[in-house]
Amino acid sequence: MNFGKPAAGGNPLDRWHDWKHTLSGAPASLRFIFAGIHRTVTLPFMPAFALTIFTGAFLLFQVQPLVGKYILPWFGGGPGVWTTCMLFFQLLLLGGYAYAHAVSRYLKPRTQAILHVVLLAAALASLPITPNDAWKPAAGDDPAWRILSLLTASLGLPYLVLSATGPLLQAWFRRTSPGTSPYRLYALSNVGSLLALMSYPFYFETNFTRFAQAQFWSWGLGFYAACCGFCAWRIWKNADEVTPSATAAASPAATADIPNPTAYQRALWICLPAVASTLLLAATNKMCLDVASIPFLWVLPLALYLLSFIISFDSPRWYSRFWFTLLLSAALIGVCLALFAGADMPIVQQVVIYSAALWVGSMICHGELYRLKPHPAHLTAFYLFIAAGGALGGLFVALVAPAIFNNYYELHLSLALLVALLLVVSAQDHAALSPRRWRVLAALLAVGAVYGADQAVTTVIAWLRTTAPALFSTVEYFWANTQHAGLHWPVWLAAGLLAALVALLRRRAQPLDGHRTTCGLLGLGLGGLIVVLGVQMRETSRGSLLTARNFYGVLSVQEYGQEDPSTHYRLLLHGRITHGIQFVAPERARTLTSYFGSRSGLGLALRTFPRQQNQRIGLLGLGVGTVAAYGKTGDYLRIYEIDPAVKQLAEKPFSYLATSDAQIELVMGDGRLSLEREPPQDFDFLIMDAFSSDAVPAHLLTREAFAIYLRHLKPDGAIIVNISNRYLDLRPVVENAARAIGFMSYTIECEDGSDDEEQGAWWLYGSSFVVLSQNRAFMENYALRNAASPAPATLNTIPLWTDDYTSMFRVLK
């Protein structure tokens, strides 16, 4: 594609048309973005406002992953860090919109310009935005409030000023160009936000260090301040020269004829963005929980969310309630399948399903929001309500949900609320669907309702099986033998017949009848969805002995095999991943389980180490405390754990810590930060087993992290890293770090059920450990060397991870 060069000189509009002609061969997505920019900047007085709004939006959203990546290692590296960051950004966005609304309503134009320039100068004086090390959390600090305080101190004023850019400059533009809709500027700001988000993981993160990124951002803020200052100067200079039409538009006589928004409209201005915001953060949590909390999995959902804003606010023709209701039905089926499949579904499929559901849901919320947009006289109030709704969604996911739920139910709730809101707006809109469309919609919703009934009946039968097995044995047998992939053919045969019957109805409904039928079936579909999601929530908590949720995630203790003491066991789940197993019977309570069997890399390293007495062992990540079973009399085991709920559960109902022969000391806080602050511990072994669900926090695998580990290790000691992961191949990352600190390394893999004393030990999982040491006598031990896996051909193709560079893309399996 040749972009060519616009002709020098001439009318600016001619040059824009030259660019438009040159882009005729560009991809459709690029032409769509260009078309929106072209329609915007060719309006009178628009270029200066457009450039300022675009730059402000770009900076506003690029700083989010940048600052998030800075503080991620300080707070455990889990998805809760990004959720809390998003809450901060939404609250500051609300503050910026409130400021813009207040000054545009109560201050004269010249006063507005002066005040905003003063705030711009103060924002520049507060640079740089990089957080100070003094903000690193100490043990016992509340992580959510610490993050909010940290971000307020380092980023608060610049972000507040940037947040006010869109609504304030649109209000200024409305004064200079009356009669021209300012809503295209809102779409342009979202284009800038989208480009900022997508450029970060694919360009800035991979090509520049964090320090360089922060420097570029500061320079960008200076450029933005200059552009914004120019716009303020124009408003100040022309305050007494406003066009007659602008004066008339702002006069009380003119605004008296403008209808005020109704309470119903204002309620939807809050509820629609609140549901979209909740859905955004819930989908982000789902995707980050099982892989890693990384910028790409932050920006992908946020980019889709913004894309829905761009499309919806560009033109009403992009959103059709009928077609997006159909798309939502398909997306909900996919989400239900993903929720029931759990961790067994490949991560790529999960990301696609949750991303599609997020985009469709956001399109519905923002499309309906655009339909409810007020007269431009109420523009800043409209944006203020949108920001308030977004902040409410963020507050709910970041602070309220962890306090009232014991599991991740935000996605379930947001989907149900989305369908309920769609039902509300459909009930208020009496524009009838055509008979063909409502029959198609009715058929699809009927299938959804039957699916809900299917899941409900399945749950009832499962419950009755335990309460009245004799009475329902025949029904249970029939139901089990008609099952296929979790669905039952009699139910789905009935669903197909019902759908065909509804679709083939020949009666031409009257407009009101068609409207009522559609709303009724939409309500039926909502009921079916609630049943399905309720069943899935029940399945999630089935068998749970204890459940705890906090900033770091959801922990669940489940109990199985009570009928046989020899197989009676408990397991700990973090999210959907098992983090430890222990038999309940006292004679089996010290059995090595899960990833830590005697044939695992950890077990082999501990058995073959030359010094077997009075070992000093450091452990990052407690789990249920299985490693403590290796402790012998005279050993010292120092365990670092960031999550207080893990400590409580490891002490009760699990008992590995209580029954260990070693002396055990627990240190609460992030393992890396704790080791940074402590004097050298002289460990014989330092074991890294810190997981967030199935993800390893990346900040524990960088060159700088291993340099810290080395300081706490005896000269002949060893580092053992558990890299067992279903989605990421972390072997090259750890072996690169070993070379960087001058250590030898072996990767030892173990299959499910491998045990020295018993074959087919179901309580032992397949595992992968990397053993690192500069102790040649230890590393050249035949048993250890013989168990090592050969190095793959791609081992040397992964760059060394540092605090300034990590890339999960390169290590995806």
Language-model regions, residue ranges each:
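Alpha-helical transmembrane segments of multi-pass membrane proteins
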Residues: I37-N796, D803-K813
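Intrinsic disorder/low-complexity segments
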Residues: M1-P44
